[in-house]
């Protein structure tokens, strides 16, 4: 939807990662090479003439953080990322997340290993905790009651129905609590510290 706002045509999901990969290949050269170089974009409509940057990054290159769930995104993350946000391919329910996340994480790490790299994973669950489960659910209800309805609908429309693979398996109706629509759609942990642990 955002691309339409700027009058752009939607670019195919996998091609977007290929284009980003080309950009980061060039950035790695800019960060690491000591001689100027020229480059004509193959997938992107840009060129670099006698390019260089100074000063160079102090630690080789800035860390790159991505979020992905698709094969094309996983390949991009394996080649370029240092930290990868992952969502549960099984949806927001903790049982399905615990069942599907280990293989999903192993896939990403193994792909990075094939490129001679290591990546770290970050899972961002929704945690709503209070002294008792009843208090936690009441607090989650309060969050839900205070959410902006139009923004939440737009978020759900743009993510649940998009071509973003990370949201596959997540629907507005399968969330344990609708608080996910207010503060995200990842794994939901709602309860007392004892029940969450």
Region spans (language model):
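An alpha-helical appendage that flanks or caps ligand/catalytic pockets
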Residues: 6-9, 13-57, 88, 94-197
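Short, solvent-exposed loop/turn and secondary-structure capping segments
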Residues: 4-6, 76
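Glycine-enriched alpha-helix->loop->beta-strand junction motifs that scaffold or abut catalytic
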Residues: 79-85
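Short, acidic/polar
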Residues: 67-76, 191-197
């Amino acid at each position: 939807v955002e691309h339409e706002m700027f009058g752009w045509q939607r670019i195919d999901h996998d091609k977007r990662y290929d284009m980003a990969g080309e950009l980061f290949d060039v950035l790695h050269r800019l960060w690491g090479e000591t001689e100027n170089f020229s480059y004509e974009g193959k997938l992107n409509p840009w060129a670099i003439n006698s390019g260089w940057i100074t000063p160079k990054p102090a630690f080789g290159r800035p860390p790159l953080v991505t979020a992905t769930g698709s094969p094309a995104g996983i390949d991009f993350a394996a080649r370029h990322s240092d930290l990868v946000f992952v969502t549960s391919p099984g949806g927001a329910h903790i049982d399905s997340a615990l069942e599907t996340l280990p293989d999903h994480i192993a896939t990403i790490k193994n792909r990075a290993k094939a490129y001679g790299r290591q990546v770290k994973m970050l899972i961002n669950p929704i945690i709503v905790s209070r002294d008792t489960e009843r208090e936690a659910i009441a607090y989650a209800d309060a969050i839900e009651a205070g959410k902006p309805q139009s923004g939440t609908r737009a978020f759900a429309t743009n993510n649940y129905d998009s071509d973003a693979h990370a949201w596959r398996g997540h629907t507005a109706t399968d969330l344990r609590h609708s608080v996910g629509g207010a503060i995200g759609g990842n794994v939901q942990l709602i309860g007392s510290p004892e029940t969450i642990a």
